[in-house]
Amino acid sequence: MAALRALLPRACSSLLSSVRCPELRRFASGANFQYIITEKKGKNSSVGLIQLNRPKALNALCNGLIEELNQALETFEQDPAVGAIVLTGGDKAFAAGADIKEMQNRTFQDCYSSKFLSHWDHITRVKKPVIAAVNGYALGGGCELAMMCDIIYAGEKAQFGQPEILLGTIPGAGGTQRLTRAVGKSLAMEMVLTGDRISAQDAKQAGLVSKIFPVEKLVEEAIQCAEKIASNSKIVVAMAKESVNAAFEMTLTEGNKLEKRLFYSTFATDDRREGMTAFVEKRKANFKDH
C-alpha cells in the first residue's frame, strides 16, 4: 500500500517528494485527466487502454489518480465498443505504491470515519475483464492494484512486493488477502513480514503472473490478449469472469451452483445460440452481445 522511500533508491525517494503534476491529458469523453492517459486500441477499438502517468513519482497512487482511474474505468465500462481493458504504467514503474505524503499525518479517527482507501477497489467491480501490464516496480498499493485486475502480464524486469511493514504499517487495500490467495500462505507471509520483493520470474512460478514478456513487448501483448477476449460475447465473458472470481469467495459446492446457474443463463442469450450454430456450421461466430 505504500510508496517506499525505504525500499527505493534515494534518488527515487527525493523525486517522490518533489513531484510536479504532468500536463493535462484529454480523454475521448472530453474529461481532463492529470494523472492518467487513456485511449482505445485494437483493430475495432475494442480495447480500452489506461496508462498511469506520474513518472516523476514512479506512479505513486495519490487520491487524484485513483479518482481519475475510476472515472476512466467507468467510461470504458459503459462503452459498448470496448470488450476488455488494459491497465499499465511506465517502463520503470507500474506503480511504486501509495502517496506517502497523503498518508503521513492521518489519524485512526480520520481513516476510520472517512473509510480511507475504500474507493481503491472500484476496479474489482468492473464487469469487463481488466489486464494489468506490469513493468518495473509494483510495490505496496501498486501490487495491490495489479492483483485487483483479472489477469497480470509482467515485463521481464518487473518486481512485486508488499513492503508496508518497513513503514510501520501493513497493506490496507487487499494485499494480505489477495496475495495469500495468489501465491499461498508461506510466500505471502514472508513478503508481508519482511517487505522483500519477488521478480517477475518468481511471481510467475508462484502463480501471481500468467505470462512474462520483454519490456518493450509487454503492452502490445496485453492488448492482443484483451482484443482476443473482446472478440467473444461481452455478456458471456462477464458471466465467465463472475464465475471464476466466485471461486475465491465461495465454497466448492456454492461455486459449482453459481457456475451452473450462469451456464444455464447463457442459454437465454442469442450469442450462445450463434456460437453453437457457428460451430456446427464450421464458421466463425458473429456475436452481437445479447
Swiss-Prot record:
Binding site for substrate: 98-101, 141
Alphabetical list of PANTHER family matching this protein: ENOYL-COA HYDRATASE, MITOCHONDRIAL (PTHR11941:SF54), ENOYL-COA HYDRATASE-RELATED (PTHR11941)
Cellular localisation: Mitochondrion matrix
N6-succinyllysine PTM sites in chain numbering: 101, 115, 204, 217
Gene Ontology process terms (BP): fatty acid beta-oxidation
Subunit structure: Homohexamer; dimer of trimers.
Pathway where this protein functions: Lipid metabolism; fatty acid beta-oxidation
The organism's taxonomic lineage, starting at the top: Eukaryota, Metazoa, Chordata, Craniata, Vertebrata
GO molecular function: 3-hydroxypropionyl-CoA dehydratase activity; crotonyl-CoA hydratase activity; delta(3)-delta(2)-enoyl-CoA isomerase activity; enoyl-CoA hydratase activity
SUPFAM superfamilies documented for this protein: ClpP/crotonase (SSF52096)
Reactions this protein catalyses: a (3S)-3-hydroxyacyl-CoA = a (2E)-enoyl-CoA + H2O; a (3E)-enoyl-CoA = a 4-saturated (2E)-enoyl-CoA; (3E)-hexenoyl-CoA = (2E)-hexenoyl-CoA; (3S)-3-hydroxybutanoyl-CoA = (2E)-butenoyl-CoA + H2O
Role according to the record: Converts unsaturated trans-2-enoyl-CoA species ((2E)-enoyl-CoA) to the corresponding (3S)-3-hydroxyacyl-CoA species through addition of a water molecule to the double bond. Catalyzes the hydration of medium- and short-chained fatty enoyl-CoA thioesters from 4 carbons long (C4) up to C16. Has high substrate specificity for crotonyl-CoA ((2E)-butenoyl-CoA) and moderate specificity for acryloyl-CoA, 3-methylcrotonyl-CoA (3-methyl-(2E)-butenoyl-CoA) and methacrylyl-CoA ((2E)-2-methylpropenoyl-CoA). Can bind tiglyl-CoA (2-methylcrotonoyl-CoA), but hydrates only a small amount of this substrate.
Annotated GO CC locations: mitochondrial matrix; mitochondrion
Residues carrying the site annotation Important for catalytic activity: 164
Name by which UniProt lists this protein: Enoyl-CoA hydratase, mitochondrial
Residue numbers bearing the Phosphoserine modification: 114
Transit peptide: 1-27
Post-translational modification: Acetylation of Lys-101 is observed in liver mitochondria from fasted mice but not from fed mice.
UniProt EC number: 4.2.1.17, 5.3.3.8
Main location group: mitochondrion
Modified residues (N6-acetyllysine): 101, 115, 211, 217
UniProt entry keywords in alphabetical sequence: Acetylation, Fatty acid metabolism, Isomerase, Lipid metabolism, Lyase, Mitochondrion, Phosphoprotein, Transit peptide
Family of this protein: Belongs to the enoyl-CoA hydratase/isomerase family.
